[in-house]
C-alpha cells in the first residue's frame, strides 16, 4: 500500500497551496535534472514543493527551494543536498516565452506538481500571479456558497 493517495497516477508531489495563493495563468511541463540519490528519493515520494519557485537565469530555468529528502539507503557521503537548485529542461522558445511572461509585473513561475511520465520525472510549472487577501476570501466564500447549494439540493432530493 502506498503512503499517500493522489488523484492522478504517477503524481509524486502536489503543491496544493500554490492554487490557493496564486492565480495560475497557464501551465507548462518541464523535465528536471536529478542525481541518482535524488531520483530514488523522488520515486519514494519524498518531495516537498511548498514554498518553491522557478527562475529564468542566463536563458536557463532553475527550481529553487524544492526539498527532496536525502535517500536513506545511501551513506552520508554519497547523498545530495536536499535544497540545492535544480535545472529544468525546456526548449529554447519555451524559455524565451516564459522569460517574457515572468518579466510582466507580478508574474512568477511556481511548480504545481512532480510526476513521472514513463520513467522520466517531470515538473508542471504554472505561470502565476499572486492573489490578494480579498481574492482568497472571495474564493472561500464562493466555495462555501457552492457547498450550501449542494446541501440544499441534496436535502430537496431526499425529501421527495
Curated annotation (Swiss-Prot):
Location(s) in or outside the cell: Cytoplasm
Lineage: Bacteria, Bacillati, Chloroflexota, Chloroflexia, Chloroflexales
Predominant place of localization: cytoplasm
Role description: Required for rescue of stalled ribosomes mediated by trans-translation. Binds to transfer-messenger RNA (tmRNA), required for stable association of tmRNA with ribosomes. tmRNA and SmpB together mimic tRNA shape, replacing the anticodon stem-loop with SmpB. tmRNA is encoded by the ssrA gene; the 2 termini fold to resemble tRNA(Ala) and it encodes a 'tag peptide', a short internal open reading frame. During trans-translation Ala-aminoacylated tmRNA acts like a tRNA, entering the A-site of stalled ribosomes, displacing the stalled mRNA.
HAMAP family: SmpB
Family the UniProt entry places it in: Belongs to the SmpB family.
GO terms for MF: RNA binding
Any one GO BP annotation for this protein: trans-translation
InterPro entries: SmpB (IPR023620), SsrA-bd_prot (IPR000037), SsrA-bd_prot_CS (IPR020081)
Pfam families named in the record: SmpB
Record-given protein name: SsrA-binding protein
Gene Ontology CC terms, in alphabetical order: cytosol
Keywords: Cytoplasm, RNA-binding
Cytoplasm among keywords: yes
Amino acid at each position: 500500500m502506498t503512503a499517500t493517495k493522489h488523484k492522478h497516477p504517477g503524481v509524486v508531489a502536489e503543491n496544493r497551496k500554490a492554487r490557493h495563493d496564486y492565480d495560475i495563468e497557464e501551465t507548462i511541463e518541464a523535465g528536471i535534472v536529478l542525481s541518482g540519490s535524488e531520483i530514488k528519493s523522488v520515486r519514494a515520494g519524498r518531495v516537498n514543493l511548498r514554498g518553491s519557485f522557478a527562475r529564468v537565469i542566463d536563458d536557463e530555468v532553475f527550481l529553487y527551494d524544492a526539498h527532496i529528502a536525502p535517500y536513506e539507503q545511501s551513506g552520508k557521503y554519497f547523498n545530495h543536498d536536499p535544497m540545492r537548485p535544480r535545472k529544468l529542461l525546456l526548449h529554447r522558445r519555451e524559455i524565451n516565452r516564459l522569460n517574457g511572461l515572468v518579466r510582466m509585473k507580478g508574474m512568477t513561475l511556481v511548480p504545481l506538481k512532480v510526476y513521472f511520465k514513463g520513467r522520466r520525472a517531470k515538473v508542471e510549472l504554472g505561470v502565476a500571479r499572486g492573489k490578494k487577501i480579498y481574492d482568497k476570501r472571495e474564493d472561500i466564500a464562493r466555495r462555501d456558497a457552492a457547498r450550501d447549494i449542494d446541501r440544499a439540493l441534496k436535502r430537496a432530493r431526499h425529501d421527495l
